[in-house]
Amino acid sequence: MECLMAVILAAGEGKRMKSKKAKVVHEIQGIPLVEWVYRSVKNAGIDEVVLVVGHKAEEVKEKMGDKVLYAFQEKQLGTGHALMQAQEYLKDKDGYVVVLYGDTPLITSKTISDTINYHREQANSATIITAVLNNPDGYGRIVRSGDGSVRKIVEHKDASLEERNIKEINSGIYCFNIRDLTEALKELDNNNSQGEYYLTDTIEILINKGKKVGAIKVEDSSEILGINDRVQLAEAGRIIRSRILKRHMKNGVTIIDPDSTYIDEDVEIGIDTVVYPSTIIEGKTKIGEDCIIGPGSRLVNAQISDRVEVKNSVVLESSIDNDTKVGPFAYVRPGSVIGKNVKIGDFVEIKKSVIGDKTKISHLTYVGDAEVGKNVNLGCGVVVVNYDGKKKNKTIIGDNAFVGCNVNLISPVEVKDNAYVAAGSTITEEVPEYSLAIARSRQTIKEDWVIKKGMLRQEKE
């Protein structure tokens, strides 16, 4: 049975990244570089994926989990040596293997699929993914024979003047016949100035054996961009962001200013939703239809239903149901569940709380560790005092309750259904249903106090 595999090389140190982390776990739009490569491989229909790890191997394994097979390169002795560490998975197999790098996040599943199909159709022993660059300086050139097959790969420093004029370059990504590759790896040596085993030498070995080596040009040369430093990381991020935004726009989402909008790969957005400038949508956020998001909002792993507005606000790991309005300048913290037709207004903070349908929390309010019922009104300046210095306590506010301005609810406490709390109160005990709670001192008037105390304020001439 024909086998289809991929080997992703991800063992390098990545010194130019100047980072404490492994290069391939640096993220673009919420996904590690190596995960981008893995997803493209899987979407191309390849089920068996081997990841060659080395530098900070445990960190890479933690990110990738058990969805890949692992090979370990103890010493970084070149790309060919890295591939040699995966030989146990190639042994005695017939079929094809795609070899690519964990720091090439822009490679697409279409390019991988096209390469495999071309490799089969041409009956190649190896197929190289190539690109045409206006400025190919520093890259290995593809020298073709008259029939279009690859005659050799010549490195820039070794190329003649005529060869340096060739603009087709080697991407370093290949499709091999597995049996031909395993035989070529047996002949690979490190007889060079660096003392390393080069993957490109396998191509020379196959050509010298009379095997057919072909090349397929990638349509977009940015796909082969390798990430070696933070500048290239930012450039790849710009390209991936553009792809993501275009996909959403083609699927019926309006994005007012793509240049200032950041949306992670796993975000889902329904049709006719409008995303305003300076908005960041991260993680596995899911947004329904006909929503207004932004300007200046940040959503992380949020679940947003239909016709919701989130303006100039932050929503973290929480859900918001249909027809609710949030903001401006609201903060919905993790673990919150906001119902339908709710208003969360300016400078309101909700933390790990449930807010019932049709409830209004319009401004300057903190609600933490609380259950707030349906059709409740919390006035300006209400504070749920949930922390006693040792632990967080729960507050329950029943349906149709009314809590006036500048009220402190000292948790644990309960305001029953249909109860009222007068403005300025500090509530420490249960407020029964249909009752009014007043917890403030009576107002005292001292007549002529200002004159008697000499406190009269007069404008200076």
Curated annotation (Swiss-Prot):
Q: Could you say which EC number(s) this protein's record lists? A: 2.7.7.23, 2.3.1.157
Write out the ranges of the annotated region (N-acetyltransferase): 252-461
Stretches for region Linker: 231-251
**Record: residues binding acetyl-CoA:** 386-387, 423, 440
Question: Which terms are listed as keywords in the entry?
Answer: Acyltransferase, Cell shape, Cell wall biogenesis/degradation, Cytoplasm, Magnesium, Metal-binding, Multifunctional enzyme, Nucleotidyltransferase, Peptidoglycan synthesis, Repeat, Transferase
Cellular component (GO) terms are:
cytoplasm; membrane
Q: Which GO terms describe its molecular function?
A: glucosamine-1-phosphate N-acetyltransferase activity; magnesium ion binding; UDP-N-acetylglucosamine diphosphorylase activity
According to its UniProt record, in which pathway does this protein act? Nucleotide-sugar biosynthesis; UDP-N-acetyl-alpha-D-glucosamine biosynthesis; N-acetyl-alpha-D-glucosamine 1-phosphate from alpha-D-glucosamine 6-phosphate (route II): step 2/2; Nucleotide-sugar biosynthesis; UDP-N-acetyl-alpha-D-glucosamine biosynthesis; UDP-N-acetyl-alpha-D-glucosamine from N-acetyl-alpha-D-glucosamine 1-phosphate: step 1/1; Bacterial outer membrane biogenesis; LPS lipid A biosynthesis
Q: Please give a single GO biological process term from the UniProt record.
A: peptidoglycan biosynthetic process
- Pfam families for the chain: Hexapep (PF00132), NTP_transferase (PF00483)
Q: Does the record's keyword annotation contain Transferase?
A: yes
* Chain sites annotated for binding UDP-N-acetyl-alpha-D-glucosamine: 9-12, 23, 73, 78-79, 101-103, 140, 155, 170, 228, 333, 351, 366, 377
Manner of cofactor binding, per the entry note:
Binds 1 Mg(2+) ion per subunit.
The entry's localization annotation reads:
Cytoplasm
Return the annotated region ranges for Pyrophosphorylase. Answer: 1-230
Which InterPro entries would you find in this protein's record?
Bifunctional_GlmU, GlmU-like, GlmU_C_LbH, Hexapep, NTP_transferase_dom, Nucleotide-diphossugar_trans, Trimer_LpxA-like_sf
Q: Which cofactor does it need?
A: Mg(2+)
Where is Mg(2+) bound in this sequence?
103, 228
Belongs to which family? Answer: In the N-terminal section; belongs to the N-acetylglucosamine-1-phosphate uridyltransferase family. In the C-terminal section; belongs to the transferase hexapeptide repeat family.
Q: Which HAMAP family match?
A: GlmU
**Oligomeric state and partners?**
Homotrimer.
Q: What is this protein called?
A: Bifunctional protein GlmU
Gene name per UniProt:
glmU
